[in-house]
Amino acid sequence: MRVLHVCSELYPILKTGGLADVTAALPPALAGFGVDSRVLVPGFPAFINAIKDKQLLINIPSRFGAEEINIFLAKIPNTKIDIYVIDAPSLFARPGNPYADSSNQAYADNYLRFALLGWVAARISEGLDAKWKPEIVHSHDWHAGLVPAYIKASELASGKKAVKTVFTVHNLAYQGLFPMSVFTELDLPGIFLSMNGLEFYGQVSFMKAGLYFADKITTVSPTYAKEIQIYEQGCGLEGLLADRHNDLYGVLNGVDPQIWNPKKDSLIATNYSSTTVATGKAKCKLALQQMMGLAEKEDALLFGIVTRLTEQKGLNLLIEAIGEITSRGGQIVLLGSGDKALEEVFLAAAKKYSKSIAVQIGYDEEQAHRIIAGSDVIMVPSRFEPCGLTQLYGLTYGTLPLVHKVGGLADTIIDSSLENLADGTATGFVFDEFSVESLTLAIRRAFALYNRKTDWKKVRKTAMQQQVTWDSSAEKIYQIYKNLVIENN
């Protein structure tokens, strides 16, 4: 089975969030089921610079404002996976963030940049590469939302049955919204600009295009698949998603054990397993405290936070709960960037409690590994969370997750309540209500359990025994593909 994945990020070449981890890990995981995956990406500088021994597949005349368009085929470095790269310098050759300028303002022509991505995917689905034609095209998030639309448009124009499409929502809150006036530049049928298409409250939505035109929709956890069908989390698209509930699947993301594995992680102070976790984590914790300038206290409960600093991630709650942690002798290490006001608040807290709180603004993949290995608790207090990968990394490293009961967090973490401790299923700390009071109670439970060393070790062992690799999830996605291929024959 041949599957083309269409996305804007791919770890380790280009990453701004968890999307890159998923698009990197899923193709090799699917290979175990006989799926021949290839990936299509925009020619951002990171991709152009990373790929070697590329071959020119085709040159395409000017389109979507790009004067020169070359499609290259190469191997993703250090893998057997093929990658198509759209080299269109006038659209993609820009430094820094792939979506926004140095002032963090989204590029005004993003609609053209990602229209080209979708249009090229449709052409590949029709045989642009004479040696490889996909049976399924799987697009990821709003950047690739037009992929199913262009494939459907081609089917309508030619009268020929098109390949089947799958669209994955990694985060419904980011919808790729543009003024209605840009539609004429997208080269799509006029009938697509309607409620039954791209139109979304007087704008054009790339996310809605993917949700409406794809044959099947997946999102990244069973709970999130339910949540996005109701008003509170549907971001205005709950009606469409509820109508398509029979085509909507919630499939948990997984962890790539080649990258996130305390037994062989070269980025952390020392390697450890579930049998050597006590001494291993103690060394990682000390190294982290030294690196971040915290007091070197082995018995201080260390809370790690690796996140984008946005309101979605529940950082406003955490700010209110800082005193609860420091007053009990706990420590905090935070890595992240985003909202400038939040950055300033956390930096001020680190200055005030310099031996208890350390903050590093920015994103550093290596430091993320060190924080997760060296912390006792990893905090993910998100207001909403489609899946979340950080808590899965925490389980893998024996760093107990403290999470809000929402989305994939609810699907993956079991609270250390008395009954769950008694039956040996607890893996972390879960708070139900999105409030400072509820978060504070979870923090207090973490301190209480930490003081009961035997129980803490049992929960940590259970956490590390959780199966969070891609094996099960890849099989579920393969079954979706398989049913679509059968349906199309």
Curated annotation (Swiss-Prot):
The keyword Transferase applies. Pfam families: Glyco_transf_5, Glycos_transf_1. Its EC number is 2.4.1.21. One of its GO terms (cellular component) is cytosol. One of its GO terms (molecular function) is alpha-1,4-glucan glucosyltransferase (UDP-glucose donor) activity. CDD domains: GT5_Glycogen_synthase_DULL1-like. InterPro entries: Glyco_trans_1, GS/SS, Starch_synth_cat_dom. Keywords: Glycogen biosynthesis, Glycosyltransferase, Transferase. It catalyses: [(1->4)-alpha-D-glucosyl](n) + ADP-alpha-D-glucose = [(1->4)-alpha-D-glucosyl](n+1) + ADP + H(+). It comes from the Bacteria. Pathway: Glycan biosynthesis; glycogen biosynthesis. GO terms for biological process: glycogen biosynthetic process. The keyword Iron-sulfur does not apply. ADP-alpha-D-glucose binds at K15. Synthesizes alpha-1,4-glucan chains using ADP-glucose. Belongs to the glycosyltransferase 1 family. Bacterial/plant glycogen synthase subfamily. PANTHER family: ALPHA AMYLASE DOMAIN-CONTAINING PROTEIN (PTHR45825:SF11), GRANULE-BOUND STARCH SYNTHASE 1, CHLOROPLASTIC/AMYLOPLASTIC (PTHR45825). This is Glycogen synthase. It comes from Francisella tularensis subsp. holarctica (strain LVS).
